[in-house]
Curated annotation (Swiss-Prot):
Disulphide bonds in the chain: none
Protein name: 2,3,4,5-tetrahydropyridine-2,6-dicarboxylate N-succinyltransferase
GO cellular component, as recorded: cytoplasm
Source organism: Sinorhizobium medicae (strain WSM419) (Ensifer medicae)
Enzymatic reactions: (S)-2,3,4,5-tetrahydrodipicolinate + succinyl-CoA + H2O = (S)-2-succinylamino-6-oxoheptanedioate + CoA
Oligomeric and partner information: Homotrimer.
Amino acid sequence: MTNHDLASLSQTIETAFENRDAVNTGTRGAVRDAVEAALNLLDSGKVRVAERAADGTWTVNQWLKKAVLLSFRLNPMELVRGGPGEAVWWDKVASKFDGWSVNEFEKAGFRAVPNCVVRRSAYIAPNAVLMPSFVNLGAYVGEGTMVDTWATVGSCAQIGKNVHLSGGVGIGGVLEPMQAGPTIIEDNCFIGARSEVVEGCIVREGSVLGMGVFIGKSTKIVDRATGEVMYGEVPPYSVVVAGSMPSGSAMGNGQPAPNLYCAVIVKRVDEKTRSKTGINELLRD
């Protein structure tokens, strides 16, 4: 699809979104065709909700988010078949694997373990491995990435290549509550078990999050070496663990107030060290 075609597609979707109250399951013609085309492009990985430039900045294609949202107005609730014992579900979004055969799986080149769920319009790159996990619509999962058991990749989230999302990890979506930008995990990151990254935060390339680290837009990310406090973004090649900071105030009874949660950068490593060092060694203080 040419840039001209994409521009025309985005304009149709932008206009439809401005008039979304008029969009419903009975809508036909250009609007439905444009939304279907956008979802197919997302599903195939030909377009992404967010793209990284050479300087590291991320650009969000808001029109693709809007296409995903419009699809909820266009599509009726339907039975989704395929559960154990002929069980069914009731939803507006089809499985990515609906109608797939051996040919489609071989062409896609990733591994989908039984009981993983991937919704249509999510892209899974070759050599990725999906354990029993959930990947929501509009998401992008890069080449060689492992989505481990019970991990969740939220709507429109962007996961880079060679990432490990450990068991029970949650990567937040953008659709509800509505976020300006998707949550992004860049290439070669390791996210420890039961950690959560949400609200459009970015974990930069090569970073390691220890088990149980929670990062949202209001979470203080503290560099232990410098004392710098930052929000919303973990710098490249950071090793991060859960911690706490003094609140700096007293309670009504005069006693010191409880410490408050923060994420602590305990060290930073270069690309060479990160590639040669085991995760457990990096997390040792």
